């Protein structure tokens, strides 16, 4: 019984620390993130409350400095958002975070990974949301424009169906 109580207490401490990291990422609190990393906290554990990953939240919310800290601490770039099963690059693309997209690409994230629900790549996400700078960053990173989503659409098809002429121009120029 004593062992069980000791183990339960340790689990509570771990959950509390993990929630602190996610709170610090969400609040863009660089000092707290740095301290948690110095204390040996792993960036590669999902938050127990939200089930999400610090690297995905930092990418989605545009926490550039925090994202750099996480990437330098070897954040796992294969982790997926618990809802859409999307990568950190998908999150950055959907939110229009071009700088974060560039950082993730530079650190070797899989650029053309498809989401399981709609088959979107990060390029599809950026284009569908009208984020031209993010789409440009993903294209410069080497994204394959010929990939089709589950509806059979390329990123160019989506731009055309959205009547987004600036995006169409970018995609045809970058072919």
Which residues make up each language-model segment?
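Conserved ankyrin/ankyrin-like repeat signature
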Residues: 32, 65-66, 99-100, 133-134, ...
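Ankyrin-repeat-protein effector appendages
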Residues: 2-23, 107, 141, 150-153, ...
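Ankyrin repeat domain, specifically the short helix-to-loop turn at the C-terminus of the second helix
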Residues: 35-42, 68-76, 102-110, 136-144, ...
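N-terminal segments that cap or nucleate solenoid repeat domains
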Residues: 3, 7-57
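Ankyrin-repeat boundary/"N-cap" motif
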Residues: 15-21, 46-54, 80-87, 114-121, ...
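Alpha-helical adaptor scaffolds
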Residues: 80-108, 112-117
């Amino acid at each position: 019984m004593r062992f069980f109580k000791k183990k339960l207490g340790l689990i509570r401490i771990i959950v509390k620390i993990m929630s602190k990291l996610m709170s610090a990422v969400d609040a863009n609190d660089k000092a707290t993130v740095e301290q948690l990393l110095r204390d040996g906290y792993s960036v590669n554990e999902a938050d127990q409350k939200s089930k999400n990953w610090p690297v995905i939240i930092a990418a989605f919310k545009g926490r550039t400095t925090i994202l750099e800290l996480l990437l330098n601490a070897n954040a796992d770039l294969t982790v997926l958002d618990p809802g859409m099963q999307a990568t950190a690059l998908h999150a950055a693309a959907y939110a229009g975070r071009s700088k974060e997209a560039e950082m993730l690409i530079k650190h070797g994230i899989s650029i053309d990974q498809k989401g399981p629900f709609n088959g979107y790549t990060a390029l599809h996400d950026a284009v569908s949301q009208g984020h031209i700078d993010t789409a440009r960053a993903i294209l410069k990173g080497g994204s394959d424009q010929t990939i089709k989503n589950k509806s059979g659409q390329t990123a160019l098809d989506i731009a055309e169906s959205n009547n987004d002429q600036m995006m169409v121009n970018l995609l045809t120029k970058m072919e």
